């Protein structure tokens, strides 16, 4: 009884602590402190100005003391007014992230798309906009035709069903608010399951520590707070349940019970395939664990005595049955889609960090920040603490060695330790491929930490001094976890804000319903759900050829090339390439040919294509490239693109000729490849130069050879001319009459590589020879204000810079349509004039 009461109390404490920090985005308590600081500074400024007038002849030290006393006196006498000012300021700060009803926006972009699918399930019974030939179709993605909805629908159906059930209790609550708080329900279920699993293995205190460690880990806390409507919590819940039930199947004695647990484990894994595309990772872990177990039985026969052969047969039958049942349940819940995607997914995981994957297209996933490579220090930052990570990993290894040497760990403990060890090793490898996978280390590390505490207390239970030290360490762990969670929770804000919402609402209100929005994939889900308009790219379709083409539009200096690519995309996505390639039968050559066609007029393009395409395909390709799109189209640029420009430019600068040569070298067919691309009209000297470079470059350095990253070196700065000089806060000095610029760096004035000046609709460049900095400066004037920023020279004339900073001045195909800004941060939408 006392154990049950302790379990309830500790579980309640875990839930309360976890809920408290996950509710921060509801009311943003961190902004209350910021509001107090702003009001206090305003009071100080006001009183300081008064003192400078009334006591201007006072000594500075006296003024400082007078200011301090006056502020204190004012705050004591006007606390009621100050409190109102703080509340007003606090409301202004947090309302930036909330709609007109005070409801915080969803946290990340994927959640907007999932909420749209969930609303469709609630209203129509299925997530797509329409059903075509039995397939769910989302009409707003992959414009102009639309695309198939992702195959994993469990989140949408579960959330819609729960909302329907909740509506019987409260029918007035909008589904959007219900979905905002949905992560709390998922977290509660996950922590309950985690606690019960740990309780069955390591007791109450160990379960408490494990759940606190996992629940408050920075990577998990930030991805499971209110407003984070995604599958992240379910992606931990299902593997934990599958593992628990599978371990039960291994350790129960009754054959019927064993089959029952096996059935439940397989069914949950099948349901997991209906939840997340990478469901198979836990199946792979279990298979590797079983291979290890079978090898151990064979190599350590004395450990299992006469049961070895029988155990070998039982385990072989069990794992075979598990795999067969799982595959059947996967097919039952998700159909053929997971099997079709499985090979490509495994191949994709192996090449996550490689831009160059011997493919015609660059690997977009390698540019996504959460899929970057990690080291132990970064893993520790995402999980919480380097010492705790090292201790947890070390203890898993120690437990694993004990299972090999001691019969003390036979049965459930041996199986649990073995599976956790395999899980940890597999996820450490996965973490080396992408930071996102760090979250899947939490379960084995958390259980290991709780297990360590339980084992240590059991071993030293008769030593009063050591027991007290352990209790103090336990208190320190709880306090440090809470402190860390508070720090992380304060940094959680939605990526959506009122500026973005205003732009998207204006798009919805002022564009035709069949309009297409062209922009980077980061904004696709917002445009689709809030503006309700078609998009070329979004977060779920980022790793497709259209991403390369869009990146090319942003960084090209040639407006004619940009509009040609946009025509092609808005007419048929990547279909023009597909038509050419089915005639040429060489994707590299097809791309080189297509890029050549995009740079010429229709008549020249016709002559080029006539040599390679049939008449019908030639006409179809020309219509896609040169035909006027049937839908109105708009182009969006935003301030957040400045930070990701290295990734965008790397994709856009992808050199297919270099890739073609490298691929041919791998296939030992370099001579034939050179002959092919020469036939396509590629400069022979350039090919010869590339071939010589390729012979000198290592395989692991190829991605740095086939492309290059461009970036902005500073934020946009604003200033005015005074005495013939413009001083910017970034250290730049500009002399308008001389048209020269200097940057104060390392106690000396240095010139940029070149100076770009935009005036009278013309973007001119002044090149500074000799020893200069390795970047350029762009300066332009609006009214009496001068604006400046530092950037790579190759970016200065790009379409992105011309649109974002110069508002499309001097361009003929992009007409300003909508603009919103926060200080010097802009979101601009342009109407594309196809004429």
Map each language-model feature to its residues.
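Membrane-interfacial entry segments at the cytosolic side of transmembrane helices
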Residues: 3-5, 257-259, 304-323, 412, ...
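Alpha-helical transmembrane segments
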Residues: 6-18, 267, 321-327
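Extracytoplasmic
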Residues: 8-91, 463-835
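Helix-to-loop transition at the C-terminal end of transmembrane segments
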Residues: 19-36, 96-107, 332-345, 487-489
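Transmembrane-lumen/periplasm boundary regions of multi-pass, lipid-linked membrane glycan transferases
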Residues: 41-42, 53-66, 72, 76-90, ...
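Active-site lumenal/periplasmic loops and adjacent helix-entry segments of GT-C-fold
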Residues: 69, 73-197, 206-213, 217-238
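Membrane-embedded helix bundles of polyisoprenyl
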Residues: 134-136, 181-200, 205-254, 258-294, ...
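Hydrophobic/aromatic-rich transmembrane helices and adjacent perimembrane loops
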Residues: 281, 426, 430-464, 468
């Amino acid at each position: 009884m006392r154990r049950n009461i302790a379990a309830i109390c500790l579980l309640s404490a875990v839930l309360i602590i976890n809920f408290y920090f996950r509710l921060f985005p509801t009311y943003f308590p961190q902004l209350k402190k910021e509001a107090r600081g702003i009001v206090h500074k305003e009071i100080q400024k006001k009183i300081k100005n008064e003192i400078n007038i009334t006591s201007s002849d006072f000594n500075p030290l006296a003024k400082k003391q007078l200011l301090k006393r006056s502020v204190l006196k004012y705050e004591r006498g006007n606390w009621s007014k100050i409190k109102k000012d703080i509340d007003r300021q606090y409301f202004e700060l947090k309302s930036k992230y909330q709609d007109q009803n005070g409801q915080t926006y969803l946290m990340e972009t994927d959640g907007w798309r999932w909420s749209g699918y969930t609303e469709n399930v609630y209203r129509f019974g299925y997530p797509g906009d329409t059903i075509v030939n039995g397939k769910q179709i989302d009409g707003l993605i992959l414009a102009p035709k639309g695309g198939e909805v992702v195959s994993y629908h469990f989140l949408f159906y579960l959330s819609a069903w729960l909302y329907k059930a909740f509506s019987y209790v409260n029918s007035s609550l909008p589904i959007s608010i219900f979905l905002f708080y949905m992560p709390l329900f998922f977290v509660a279920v996950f922590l309950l399951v985690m606690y019960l699993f740990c309780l069955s293995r390591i007791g109450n205190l160990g379960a408490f520590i494990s759940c606190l460690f996992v629940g408050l880990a920075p990577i998990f806390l930030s991805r499971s707070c209110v407003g984070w409507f995604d599958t992240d919590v379910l992606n931990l819940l299902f593997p934990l349940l599958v593992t628990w039930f599978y371990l039960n199947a291994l350790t129960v004695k009754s054959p019927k019970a064993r089959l029952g647990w096996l059935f439940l484990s397989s069914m949950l894994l099948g349901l997991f395939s209906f939840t997340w595309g990478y469901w198979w990772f836990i199946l792979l872990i279990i298979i590797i664990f079983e291979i290890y177990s079978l090898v151990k039985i064979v190599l350590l026969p004395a450990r299992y005595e006469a049961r070895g052969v029988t155990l070998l047969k039982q385990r072989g039958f069990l794992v075979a049955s598990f795999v067969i049942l799982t595959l059947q349940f996967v097919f039952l819940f998700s159909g053929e889609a997971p099997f079709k995607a499985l090979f490509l997914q495994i191949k994709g995981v192996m090449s996550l960090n490689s831009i160059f994957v011997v493919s015609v297209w660059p690997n977009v996933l390698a540019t996504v920040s959460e899929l970057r490579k990690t080291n132990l220090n970064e893993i520790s930052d995402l999980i919480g603490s380097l010492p705790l990570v090292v201790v947890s990993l070390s203890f898993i290894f120690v437990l694993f060695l004990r299972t090999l040497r001691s019969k003390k760990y036979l049965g459930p403990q041996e199986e649990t330790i073995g599976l956790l060890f395999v899980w940890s090793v597999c996820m450490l490898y996965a973490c080396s491929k992408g930071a996102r996978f760090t979250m899947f280390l939490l379960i084995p590390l958390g259980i290991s930490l709780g297990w360590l505490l339980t084992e240590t207390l059991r071993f030293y239970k008769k030593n009063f001094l050591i027991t007290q030290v352990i209790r103090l360490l336990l208190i320190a762990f709880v306090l440090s976890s809470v402190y860390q969670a508070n720090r992380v929770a304060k940094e959680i804000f939605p990526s959506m804000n009122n500026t973005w919402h205003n732009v998207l609402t204006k798009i919805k209100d002022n564009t035709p319903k069949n309009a297409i929005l062209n922009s980077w994939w980061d904004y696709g889900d917002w445009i689709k759900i809030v503006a309700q308009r078609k998009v070329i790219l979004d977060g779920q379709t980022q790793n497709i050829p259209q991403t390369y083409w869009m990146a090319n539009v942003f960084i090209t200096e040639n407006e004619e090339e940009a509009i040609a690519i946009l025509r092609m995309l808005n007419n048929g996505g990547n279909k023009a390439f597909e038509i050419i390639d089915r005639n040429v039968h060489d994707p590299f050559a097809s791309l080189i040919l297509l890029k050549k066609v995009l740079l010429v007029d229709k008549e020249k393009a016709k002559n080029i294509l006539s040599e390679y395409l049939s008449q019908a395909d030639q006409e179809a390709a020309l219509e896609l490239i040169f035909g006027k799109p049937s839908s109105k189209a708009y182009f969006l640029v935003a301030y957040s693109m400045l930070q990701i420009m290295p990734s965008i430019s790397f994709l856009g600068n992808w050199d297919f000729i270099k890739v073609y040569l490298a691929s041919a070298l791998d296939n030992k067919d370099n001579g034939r490849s050179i002959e092919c691309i020469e036939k396509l009209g590629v400069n022979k000297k350039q090919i010869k130069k590339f071939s010589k470079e390729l012979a000198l470059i290592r395989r692991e350095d190829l991605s740095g050879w086939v492309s290059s990253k461009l970036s902005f070196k500073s934020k946009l700065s604003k200033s005015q001319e005074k005495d013939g000089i413009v001083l910017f806060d970034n250290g730049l000095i500009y002399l308008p009459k001389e048209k020269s610029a200097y940057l104060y760096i390392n106690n000396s004035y240095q010139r940029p590589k070149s100076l770009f000046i935009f005036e009278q609709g013309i973007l001119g460049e002044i090149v500074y020879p000799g020893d200069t900095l390795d970047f350029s400066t762009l300066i332009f004037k609006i009214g009496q204000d001068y604006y400046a920023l530092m950037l790579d020279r190759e970016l200065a004339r790009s379409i992105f810079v011309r649109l974002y900073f110069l508002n499309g001045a001097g361009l003929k195909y992009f007409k300003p349509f909508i603009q919103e800004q926060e200080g010097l941060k802009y979101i601009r939408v342009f109407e594309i004039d196809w004429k």
